[in-house]
Structures are given as structure tokens and as C-alpha cells.
């Protein structure tokens, strides 16, 4: 992948050297989980204290809405669980997990969605989102927008309000961000799918 294929405008508040360092820790694995997919691996970012610190500072600096415009952070399984709780703690907010189907005790609500490589379903506990609670949905990446839109639907079914979406990476050429409509969004790094 050429460096010119990577856009790091969401990292503009961390400086060019830190942005380059962070991007250098993101691996690209062709053909995983199936042929034709370019998997973007963030695990090396988490294993590197400097890169993880840069990432969390950048997520906080690039919020798509003011910190007072939401009450809770929602993280999507699985890698949204890595960044969502850390961001929530930095911001003094609570955290809500949206999980794969069958992983939460009753009572739950579920929503099916399409992945770039298949179909799946996710759930939320009905007692964690209350009427009118405003949330920021956080995930590691947006591709088709299926997961993010399913989470939005779950929050709204529970009576919550989605204030915005924050992603570490956006895969371009798939129009996932467009699928979110007029919601405020942010992404730190854009790479071609």
C-alpha cells in the first residue's frame, strides 16, 4: 500500500511525526478473513504504549460532537471494546457494549446487518439505554456502515439518541460514512478498501 493512499486528516492535532508513527503500526493483511478482503490490524497499535497513547489522544481531539453533547460511549464488538471504554474513561462517561448475538443475558434487543464479507446480528441489553440518553458510537473502523447502522438502530429502539460516530479508520471506496446520513462523524485514518 502506497503512503499516498493513506489520509490522516483526523490525526492533524497530534502532529506529523506522531501521525506517521501511529500509521506505521497498522498492519494490512490481504485475503483475511477471506480472499479479496484487505484486513486492517490495529493490534500492534495496542501493543505499543506510544502508539496507543497517540491514538487515544487523537480520538479525544477529533470528537465529532462536543463532549457535553453525549452522555455515554457505545462500543461495538469486538475492537470497539478496545477503544470505547478507554475513550469513555478519558471523557468521564459511562460505557455501553453492543455485542454479537447470544453473548448477553436477557433481556436484549437484536438487529441483523450486512458485513463486507457476510451477514451477522448484534444485541444490546435493554436496561442499559434509557429514554433520551445521548450516545457516541465508537468502533475501530467503518467499511460498509452495516455494523454502525445496526448499532444506531438498537440505540434508537431502546429510546436513546445517537449524537455521532467516531471511528479509528475509514475504508474508502465503500461509502460506509455516506450510509450514516447526516449524523456527525469522525475518522482518524482513511485507507482504501
From Swiss-Prot:
GO terms for molecular function: adenine binding; adenine phosphoribosyltransferase activity; AMP binding. Pathway: Purine metabolism; AMP biosynthesis via salvage pathway; AMP from adenine: step 1/1. PROSITE patterns: PUR_PYR_PR_TRANSFER. It is found in: Cytoplasm. One of its GO terms (biological process) is AMP salvage. HAMAP family: Aden_phosphoribosyltr. Homodimer. This is Adenine phosphoribosyltransferase. It comes from Bifidobacterium adolescentis (strain ATCC 15703 / DSM 20083 / NCTC 11814 / E194a).
